[in-house]
């Protein structure tokens, strides 16, 4: 179980998270939902060790076991789709990248560069790159932005099938409802 206890994060005078406590199972897909500015991304960043809270603590999760998908795709324009995955695949560089391409439905785009991809395709490539890290816990910030709803549902099901804990920020109600649990931030 991942325990978040009395977490408070401020950006100057603005309070992003105020005394937030939540338990998140280390299995299945958990969606973080709520209005813009309620702290979903901030909570994800704290869980991933990318920022420190002013108060509170987290137990049951170490940043080294997480893979983080940022809201921005952060793709390298000079690397092909396949190279983006082979750069990070730790175990089976010849096999694993194609597996992740298949999971995010980018087969046939191996030699394409990011500039040739649609927004949804670039988002799926960023997700594939995150998956290729083969970390224990996936922290995904709006993983389906620009991805059509049917494809997003298929990929979400594949994420569930991985059997890893996934914590994602979801703005799409139908995707949040398809997750194993929903945590609402206000």
Describe these PLM feature segments.
Residues 113-121:
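Conserved ABC ATPase signature
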Residues 138-142:
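Catalytic Walker B motif of ABC-type/P-loop ATPase nucleotide-binding domains
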């Amino acid at each position: 179980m991942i325990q978040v206890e009395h977490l408070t994060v401020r950006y100057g005078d603005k309070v992003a998270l105020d005394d937030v406590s939540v338990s998140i199972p280390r299995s299945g897909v958990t969606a973080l939902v709520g209005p813009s500015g309620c702290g979903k991304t901030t909570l994800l960043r704290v869980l991933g060790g990318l920022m420190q809270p002013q108060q509170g603590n987290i137990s049951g999760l170490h940043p080294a076991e997480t893979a983080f998908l940022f809201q921005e795709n952060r793709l390298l324009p000079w690397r092909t789709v396949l190279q983006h995955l082979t750069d990070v695949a730790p175990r089976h560089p010849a096999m694993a990248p194609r597996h992740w391409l298949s999971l995010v439905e980018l087969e046939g785009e191996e030699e394409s560069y990011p500039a040739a991809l649609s927004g949804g395709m670039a988002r799926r490539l960023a997700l594939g790159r995150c998956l290729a890290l083969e970390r224990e816990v996936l922290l995904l910030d709006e993983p389906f932005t620009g991805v059509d709803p049917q494809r997003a549902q298929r990929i979400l099901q594949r994420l569930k099938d991985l059997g890893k804990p996934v914590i994602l920020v979801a703005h799409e109600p139908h995707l949040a409802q398809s997750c194993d649990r929903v945590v609402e931030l206000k």
